[in-house]
Regions:
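Class I SAM-dependent transferase core
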Residues: 25-76
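Bacterial N-terminal signal peptides that target proteins for export
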Residues: 2-12
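S-adenosyl-L-methionine
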Residues: 110-143
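C-terminal motif of bacterial Sec signal peptides marking the signal peptidase cleavage site
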Residues: 21-23
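C-terminal substrate-binding/active-site "lid" region of AdoMet-derived donor-dependent transferases
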Residues: 154-211
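Conserved SAM-binding motif I beta-strand of class I
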Residues: 102-107
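Conserved class I S-adenosyl-L-methionine
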Residues: 78-87
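Glycine-rich SAM-binding Motif I of class I
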Residues: 89-93
């Protein structure tokens, strides 16, 4: 069952008080663990899916959603993917494994960065998939041709000016679950009840979107 944005935010406050971190998991541990068991054997998932990650908790994206996110962006071997909030690395690893493209995963949690790096090695894509421990708001995105996100609505909105400022026109952005306010997506796709939003950075940023 999907939560409304308001109820999801309220739920975050309650859980945040209990575990002492900002943000929350929008699903139970049972659901998160179920998602994890569907992932590629080359990818392991931390036992605690609610491990703190700065502004956003870690909740793994299901494999079928990962696949469609890459499909909707029409990625190819010449692309450079940046996954912001990369968790166990599954999006970057799948992109490298399936399409032969390069990718960088950014996460503030050092344990998840280590796990993702180990997963890339196990999958045999360490030469194309790398992971860095960093605040995503401090990450240089200028080399990206594709950016993937699974954050929160308010984080997407805080990130939007940075995307406009640093990404080249034509760069594709794909977000699992959350939009970017009044920036209308070019496509919206549903996969097993989960929503994927897709944008392309325009040559001219409308004045109404710059703030």
């Amino acid at each position: 069952m999907q939560l409304t944005r308001l109820s999801f935010q309220a739920f975050c406050i309650v859980v945040g008080l209990g575990i002492g971190v900002l943000g929350c998991t929008p699903s139970s541990n049972k659901t998160a663990n179920a998602d994890s068991t569907q992932s590629s054997p080359a990818i392991t998932t931390a036992q605690d899916d609610s491990a703190p990650r700065g502004d956003v908790p870690y909740v793994p994206t299901p494999p079928e959603v990962v696949s469609e996110m890459l499909n909707i962006a029409k990625v190819n071997k010449n692309d450079m993917l940046y996954d912001l909030g990369s968790g166990d690395g599954r999006i970057v690893i799948e992109a490298a494994r399936r399409y032969g493209m390069r990718g960088v995963g950014v996460d503030i949690n050092p344990e998840l960065v280590k796990e993702a790096t180990d997963n890339a090695r196990k999958a045999g894509v360490s030469d194309r998939a790398s992971f860095v421990e960093q605040d995503l708001f401090k990450t240089d995105l200028s080399k990206a041709t594709v950016v993937t996100l699974y954050l929160l609505p308010e984080v997407n909105m805080r990130l939007r000016p940075k995307l406009f400022r640093e990404l080249k026109p034509g760069t594709r952005i794909v977000s699992h679950a959350f939009d970017m306010g009044d920036w209308k997506p070019e496509r919206v796709v549903e996969v097993d009840g989960r929503t994927i939003y897709y944008w392309v950075v325009p040559k001219e940023i409308p004045t109404s979107l710059k703030n």
